[in-house]
Amino acid sequence: MKTRLVNSLAALALLFGFCAPALAQQVPDAIINNDGIGFSRMADGQLIAYDLVAAYDEHMIVEADCSAYKSRLQGVDWCFASAANQSSFEAATQDNGRNKYLPFVGGHCALGMSVGNLTARGDPRTAVRIGNLLVLNGRFEVRTSFLQDTERNIDNARLRYELAIAAGNLKVNE
């Protein structure tokens, strides 16, 4: 009996020893991206990128042209619909890497993040500018729920996002 217990514990230790590196690799990115492209989504196996400058400045969801207009910031490529929008994005980038156009809480679903869901992805089509924040949610119905208590949801999402990064539960994109 004692031998079987020791063998079982050894097997569990071995199993967790092999799983630990795999679990460590499962930490979600701080900035949501698809194949390295931020403010994008997958549809029918195709990557669709959107112009976050158009979403922020013009309140319009516009598809971007990654082959013509692309900038890299915080380990992610950002695509634009025009050279003017790319220039606006680049001009807004500060020395510390901050940029007003970057999606709030890294493009995660803001309502999901406000309740601690670190894996809920924001859909760029739901983007809405609230003050100086470009806020995404997973679906339009979720955005509606988020907007019912915007201030509290923004505060909770910001806090949980910052705590998740500090605790290593979200990894900073490189």
Residue ranges, per PLM feature:
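Bacterial N-terminal signal peptides that target proteins for export
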Residues: 1-9
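Bacterial N-terminal signal peptides
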Residues: 9-17
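Sec/Tat signal peptide C-region and signal peptidase I cleavage site
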Residues: 19-24
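Charged, low-complexity intrinsically disordered segments
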Residues: 25-174
